[in-house]
Curated annotation (Swiss-Prot):
Active-site residues per Swiss-Prot or TrEMBL entry: D61
Organism: Actinobacillus pleuropneumoniae serotype 5b (strain L20)
Family affiliation: Belongs to the uracil-DNA glycosylase (UDG) superfamily. UNG family.
UniProt protein name: Uracil-DNA glycosylase
Top EC group: hydrolase
UniProt xrefs under Gene3D superfamilies: Uracil-DNA glycosylase-like domain (3.40.470.10)
Functional note: Excises uracil residues from the DNA which can arise as a result of misincorporation of dUMP residues by DNA polymerase or due to deamination of cytosine.
SMART domains to which the protein is assigned, alphabetical: UDG, UreE_C
InterPro entries: UDG_fam1, Ura-DNA_Glyclase_AS, Uracil-DNA_glycosylase-like, Uracil-DNA_glycosylase-like_sf
Pfam families, A to Z: UDG (PF03167)
GO MF annotations, alphabetized: uracil DNA N-glycosylase activity
Localization in the cell: Cytoplasm
Length: 225
């Protein structure tokens, strides 16, 4: 199994999945602002092919402010400033990865292109209303994504931050994959153990131990936009 079409093609034909797309389309048609924009809902899959995934970082639902969400968990397009959870991820990276310099943006595409699947468990949201699409059925779809990676790939690293992500990843086979857990990087919980978790260096140590090229976590310091 090499690509997302093979991994998820049948799933996308399921009635529940068609119903999700209909619900989202109906909201947009009714003038409701839904994030991310339609063409970016599946960006995580477009940027990180099934066979290329090395690391999975699970988010929850997309940012619900204007010009933030673009289909990658935790990532924002310039010139939007990095949101608080991402700021804390950068702080941890600076402590954990020698030489890491904090960029002036929150655009994580360079991670995605190296095999970091930045997957939200719900793929759309209404503007200004967190978790507004949580009951649309997206969780069934993203459960399938994780199940296919769990079953058909090996030696992946799953970074599960916060109780929601940890519950979502509870069935991952720990004998085939590396599962790292910590509190969420949100300012509400980062001090409970996200800071100091060293997940970024641990990820690379695991990949190297399996003969897999590590992730270069350093992002470009500035992005022209």
């Amino acid at each position: 199994m090499n690509n997302w079409t093979e991994a998820l093609g049948e799933e996308k034909q399921q009635p529940y999945f068609q119903h999700i797309l209909q619900q989202v389309h109906q909201e947009r048609m009714n003038g409701v602002t839904v994030f991310p924009p339609q063409k970016e809902v599946f960006s995580a899959f477009a940027l990180t092919e099934f066979k290329d995934v090395k690391v999975v970082i699970l988010g929850q639902d997309p940012y619900h402010g204007p010009n933030q969400a673009h289909g990658l968990a935790f990532s924002v397009k310039p010139p939007v400033a990095p949101p608080p959870s991402l700021v804390n991820m950068y702080k941890e990276l600076a402590q954990d990865v020698e030489g890491f310099q904090i960029p002036n943006h929150g655009y994580l595409v360079d991670w995605a292109k190296q095999g970091v699947l930045l997957l939200n468990t719900v793929l759309t949201v209404r503007q200004g209303q967190a978790h507004s699409h949580a009951n649309f059925g997206w969780e069934i779809f993203t459960d399938k994504v994780i199940a296919q990676l769990n079953q058909h790939r090996e030696n992946l690293v799953f970074l599960l931050w916060g109780s929601h992500a940890q519950k979502k990843g509870q069935f991952i086979d720990r004998s085939r994959h590396c599962v790292l857990t910590a509190p969420h990087p949100s300012p509400l919980s980062a001090y409970r153990g996200f800071f100091g978790c060293k997940h970024f260096s641990k990820t690379n140590r695991y990949l190297l131990s399996k003969g897999i090229a590590p992730i270069n976590w350093q992002l470009r310091l500035e992005i022209d936009y």
